[in-house]
């Protein structure tokens, strides 16, 4: 049963509804919510084996059940502003984005700007065949691959934007497993800082049910 809950859609949604109803949010929930409201690029990087679309359904549920109407309006406005600033899509699309229903705008953002990495899933294994060897047995490797892939996505969008500024990139990562926290810190210091020297990395260590903020950069 535990393994089914780790992979199947219905138990995941049921668990999420239970947590929402009982306000059982993790230490980084407000930071996650803030990132969505500001329409930032976001990644969910988990050892779960669900399909990525299950996680998207979960994020939509969080928005529907935990955001106020005012927070939703601010989020929609920020989504529109971010796409207009980036010039990622043509003017016709941008005009349609400004005139569409709020739910459709949020859904587009959740498809385009939010990445869902379920590192124990078949989807993940198929997407990163050349880089992994049974990542389901090694979530550490899977999470490292996901982090690197997400950073590449962010940088590609920045390079395409009207005014790329690589000195203002901040990457935050939240983790509640101490062993994984240490592994990701080590990975950033030994590899990612050399590849991306201008990125400001922030690790939120939630391993003791409270948040310890760790900053890693070359500044």
Where are these regions (language model features)?
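Asp-based, Mg2+/Mn2+-dependent phosphohydrolase catalytic module
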Residues: 165-167, 179-219
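Alpha-helical scaffold elements lining the catalytic groove of polysaccharide deacetylases
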Residues: 117-118, 123-149, 153
